[in-house]
Regions:
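Sec-dependent N-terminal signal peptides
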Residues: 6-13
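C-terminal motif of bacterial Sec signal peptides marking the signal peptidase cleavage site
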Residues: 15-18
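Extracellular beta-rich repeat passengers
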Residues: 25-73, 77-78, 89-102, 109, ...
Length: 410
C-alpha cells in the first residue's frame, strides 16, 4: 500500500512538473501522508507563481497559496469557483496576481460564498502581500491609439483603443491585507485596473485593511458597482490617466481608532492625469467618471493629537480633485471630515477649476454631517463659490450598504 502511494505521488509530481514547464509557471505540492499505516489520507497545499500561458482553473477542494508573482498571460483565463479562499505568502510586494492584456479572470462568488484573497500569516496585517492587478486595452491618456504604457507593479503593458475590452468578471470578491510596498514610490493597491475596458464585469467587491490604496483606476472605461473599502492606510479609491467609467454604490469607512502611523488618508483621490513618475505632463484627455450613491465615514472633523496619537484625523479631505479631473458625483453622504471636497488646479495643465465652470465637475445631492469645510477652493479661480460646485445640499442619502454588504463583507 505504501509503495503504491509513493508511485502515485511520483506520477502526480511528474504530471504537474510537465504542466509547469509548459506554462513557465511554478506549481509545488506539499503532500503529507497521514495514514499511520492504516490507509491513505493526503493533505495538499498548492503553491502558485510564475506565468501561465494556458488556462488555469482552480479546484475548490485544494488549498492554494500564492508564493510569488502569478501572471496570467495573453489568451489565458484564470477561473476561481465561488467560496474559495486563496492565501498569499506574507512576503510583501513580490506576491501578487496579475491578469495581463488579452487574459481574463473569472472569479464569481455569491453573497453566501464569496471569493477571498487574503494573507497566510497567523496574525495577518496590512501590506502582507501585493494585490490583484488587471491590465486591459482600453484608452489611457498618456499615449494615443494602440500604444501602451507600463504598469507600476509587474512592468506589464496596458492601454490601447478598445473601450469595451473584456478582462473577465469579478463578483463577490474580498481582498484582505494587501498593499505590499516595493519601494518609496511603487506600492500595490488592493485592486488595480490598468486600462481595463467596460466589457469587464465588476460587482460586489470589498478591499479590507490594505496598506496602500484600495481600488485604483489607471485610465480605462471599466464600470464597477457595490464597492466597499474599509480600514485602508492610504486612499480608498483613486483614479488617474483619463479614467472615464462609472462607480456606483460605494461604502468607504476609515480606520475608526487611528494612531499617528496607523490611519486612513483620503476617501477619493482623483487625478486627471498621472505625473507621479513623470510619464504624462501633456494628457490627451482628462479623467471624467460618474460616481453615484456614495457613503463616506471618517472619524470626526476635529484635528487633535494626544500623546503622539491622532484622536481625530479631520485634517484629511474626504475627496481631493486635482490635475484637471472632471467628475459628476450624485447622492453622496459624508460624515466626519475637516474638509469634504478639496479642488486643486486651474492653469492650462491642471484645469480642474475650469471643469467646474464648464459644469463637468459637480456634486449633486449631498449631505454633510460633522464636516467643517464643504468646498475648499484651491483652483486659483477666486470667483468660484460653493454654489458653483454643489447643489442639493442636504438631499444625499448615500448607499444602502447594510443591505448589499450583508453576509459577505467584513
Amino acid at each position: 500500500m505504501r509503495n503504491n502511494f509513493l508511485l502515485s505521488l511520483v506520477a502526480l509530481t511528474l504530471i504537474f512538473t510537465s504542466c509547469a514547464n509548459d506554462d513557465t509557471a511554478d506549481i509545488v505540492f506539499n503532500i503529507t501522508n497521514n495514514n499511520g499505516g492504516g490507509g491513505t489520507s493526503v493533505d495538499t497545499d498548492v503553491f502558485l507563481s510564475g506565468t501561465y500561458t494556458n488556462d488555469l482553473t482552480l479546484d475548490a477542494n485544494i488549498n492554494y497559496k500564492i508564493n510569488g508573482s502569478l501572471v496570467i498571460a495573453d489568451g489565458a483565463t484564470l477561473t476561481i469557483p465561488a467560496g474559495m479562499t486563496i492565501k498569499a505568502l506574507a512576503a510583501g510586494s513580490d506576491v501578487y496576481v496579475a491578469i495581463s492584456q488579452g487574459a481574463k479572470i473569472i472569479a464569481e462568488g455569491t453573497a453566501n460564498s464569496p471569493i477571498v484573497f487574503t494573507s497566510d500569516a497567523s496574525e495577518p496585517k496590512a501590506g502582507d502581500w501585493g494585490g490583484l492587478i488587471l491590465l486591459g486595452k482600453a484608452p489611457i491618456n498618456s499615449v494615443t491609439g494602440t500604444a501602451t504604457s507600463t504598469s507600476e507593479i509587474a512592468g506589464l503593458p496596458y492601454g490601447g483603443n478598445i473601450a469595451n475590452d473584456n478582462s473577465g468578471s469579478l463578483k463577490y470578491v474580498r481582498i484582505e491585507y494587501s498593499g505590499g510596498s516595493a519601494d518609496g514610490q511603487s506600492e500595490n493597491n488592493g485592486l488595480s485596473f490598468y486600462g481595463v475596458g467596460n466589457g469587464t464585469e465588476v460587482d460586489y467587491i470589498q478591499i479590507y485593511e490594505g496598506k496602500d490604496d484600495g481600488v485604483e483606476f489607471f485610465g480605462g472605461t471599466v464600470n464597477v458597482s457595490h464597492v466597499a473599502v474599509m480600514d485602508l492606510q492610504d486612499d480608498s479609491i483613486d483614479w488617474t490617466e483619463g479614467y472615464s467609467g462609472t462607480i456606483t454604490d460605494v461604502y468607504i469607512q476609515h480606520i475608526q481608532n487611528p494612531t499617528e502611523t496607523f490611519n486612513s488618508d483620503k476617501a477619493f483621490e482623483c487625478d486627471g492625469y498621472n505625473d507621479d513618475f513623470g510619464n504624462n505632463s501633456n494628457p490627451v484627455f482628462f479623467s471624467n467618471p460618474t460616481v453615484t450613491n456614495v457613503t463616506i465615514v471618517g472619524v470626526g472633523s476635529d484635528n487633535t493629537f494626544q500623546d503622539g496619537k491622532i484622536i481625530n484625523a479631520g485634517q484629511y479631505e474626504a475627496v481631493r480633485l486635482r490635475r484637471g479631473t472632471a467628475a459628476i458625483f450624485s447622492n453622496v453622504q459624508i460624515t466626519g471630515f475637516g474638509e469634504a471636497f478639496d479642488v486643486d488646479g486651474n492653469d492650462t495643465s491642471d484645469p480642474t477649476g475650469q471643469a467646474i465652470v464648464d459644469d463637468e465637475l459637480q456634486v449633486n445631492n449631498v449631505t454633510f454631517t460633522d464636516v467643517t469645510t464643504k468646498f475648499k477652493n484651491d483652483t486659483g479661480n477666486d470667483t468660484l463659490t460653493e454654489a458653483d460646485f454643489i447643489s442639493g445640499d442636504g438631499n444625499g442619502t448615500g448607499t444602502d450598504f447594510a443591505t448589499w454588504g450583508s453576509g459577505w463583507t467584513k
